[in-house]
Amino acid sequence: MNQRSYNIFFHLHTISGIIISAALFVIFFAGSFAFFRDEIANWQKNKEMPAIETGITINIDTVLDSLNNTYQLYGRDIEIGKHYNERRIDVNLSASKDSTASEESKKGAFFYLDTNTFHTYNYQESYTLGEFLYRLHFFAQIPYPYGYYLSGFVAFFFLFALITGILIHWDKIVTNFYVFRPKAKLKTIWTDAHTALGLIGFPFQFVYAVTGAFFMLSAIMAAPNIFFLYDGDQQKMYEELEYTEKPEALSYEKLKTIPSVEKYVTNTKATWEDFSISHIHIHNFGDKDMKVSVEGELNKKEKFTGNGKIVYQVSTNKILSKRNPFTETTYLDGVKNVLYRLHFGDYSGYSLKIISFLLGLISCFVIISGVLIWLVARDKRHIPEKKRKFNKWLVTIYIAICLSMYPTTALSFIAVKIFPFADKAFIYQFYFICWLILSIIFICKQSLYSINRYALLIGSIIGFFIPISNGIITGNWFWKSYSENLFQSFFIDIFWLVLASITLLVSFKIRKNQYKTFNSSKTS
C-alpha cells in the first residue's frame, strides 16, 4: 500500500473510531452481559428453568381456560409465544372482530403469564435487569426509533472502522500480531494491545457490526421498498417477509364447542423429532373460521435454521399448510435465522456464550486502548496547550463514562436482589442515577490512572457481594444451588466470583508510573 492510501485509511479509521467510541463501548459492554439475559432474569426472580430451552410446554387448553375467565375471547386473534428461557410466556390478544362485542372486548391486551402460578404481569412489572442490559445494548431506552437508529449507525461506522483498521495493518498483519513490548513507551504498549486483540476479535466484531447494522437500520432500508414495491402498503411487505400473518375474516358463526388446541400442539410436536414449540397463533377464536397455527424449531444442534409450521382448520381438523423444518427451509428463513443465530450466539450452549462474553470484553479493551492511543499521539509539545488539555478532558470523560458501567452494573445486581419487586422504573432510575454519579466522580478525579484502577477495584468488591446477597436473601448459596441442580442461580454467582477475581487482579497490576505520559497536566 502506498503512503497516500495508508494515510487516508489511517485517518478514516481514527476519525470513525473516535466518534463512536463511547457509544460502541456501551453496546459491547451491555451486549456482553446480554448473552446471559435469561440467566440474569431467572436469578433475579429466583425462578429456575432448564438450562436447555424446551419451548412452550404448558397445556394450552389450560391457558385458554384461564384467559377466558378474564377476557371474552370470541372473535379475537390470540398469539402465545416464548422468546426467552423463562417461566413466563407472552400473550397477545387482538381486539375482537365481532362488531356486536362489548366495548371491553374491542380492546386488545398484551401481558406475560407465569406458567406455574397463572399470574399475569404487564411489561413494566415483568421487567428485569437482564432485559435492561439487553435493551441498553441497542439504546432502546432512548425514545423509538432514535435509539435504534443511533445503535445502527454506530454499528455501521464500526464496520467502517474495522475494515480500515485491517487495511492499515495489512502489510504487517502477521508480524505485528506477535509483537508485544511491555517495557516500551505507553503509546507502543497500547498500540500492540490494540493491534493484537483487535485481530483476535476481528471475526467476532465483524459479525456483530454487520448483523447489528442490519437489525437496527432495516426499517430505513425497507422504506424505499415499501414505497416502490408495495405502493406504500407496509402491512403487505411484513406479511411477505413473514413477520406478521394475514388477518382472517370472521364468519359470525360460533362453534358449538371449542375443540382442544393442545391436541394440535401435541400433533405438531410429534411430527418432527427434537421439535420445540415457540409460537401458537389462534385466528378467530370460537368461530367457524377458527384456525390454529403452530410454529417451532428443531434443536439447533440438529439443524441450524430448522423452522417448521403447521396450520390447522379447526372446524374440519384438516391441515391447511405444512412447512417441514428439515426439507422446506426457505431462503428467507435461512437469511433471517442465520443473522439471528449469529448475533445472539444461542446455537451452542454455554461454551459459546462464555466465549462471546470474553470476546465482547476484549472488544471493550480494544475500544479503550484505541482512545488512549489517540490521546498519546496528540500529547506532543508542538500541539497547542489548549488543544492538549481539551483532548485530555475529552478522553477523561470518555473513560469515566465507559468504565463506571462496571461498578454500576455490579451494584444493580445487588439492588434488584434486595428489592424483589424492582420494576422497569426502579431499574431505570437506579442504574442511570448510579452511572451518572460515578461518572461525575471519576471525571472530577481528572486522573486516568484513578479511573482505570478504582473502577475495576470498586466493581470487583461489589461483584464479590453479589453471590453473598443472593445467599442471604434467598438462601441459595452457590454450593447449595449446585447440589440442588439450580444451575442458573449457581452460574450467575460463580460468574461474578470469577469476573470479580479477574478484574481485582487487573486493578492491582495497574501502576501509576504507567500513566506518567499524562503527568504534565491535571489529567495525569
Tell me what each language-model feature is.
Residues 1-40, 145-233:
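Internal alpha-helical transmembrane segments
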Residues 98-138, 163, 300-341, 365-372:
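Extended, hydrophilic extramembrane loops/domains of integral membrane proteins
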Residues 206-221, 405-428:
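Alpha-helical transmembrane segments and their membrane-interface junctions
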Residues 436-524:
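Generic detector of multi-pass transmembrane helix bundles and their immediately adjacent loops
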Residues 401-414, 424-443, 458-466:
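Generic alpha-helical transmembrane segments
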Residues 2-4, 8-11, 152-199, 357-404, ...:
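Juxtamembrane interface at the cytosolic side of transmembrane helices
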Residues 38-80, 235-293, 299-304, 315-324, ...:
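Membrane-proximal low-complexity regions enriched in glycine and acidic/polar residues
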Residues 3, 23-29, 33-134, 138:
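Juxtamembrane extramembrane loops of integral membrane proteins
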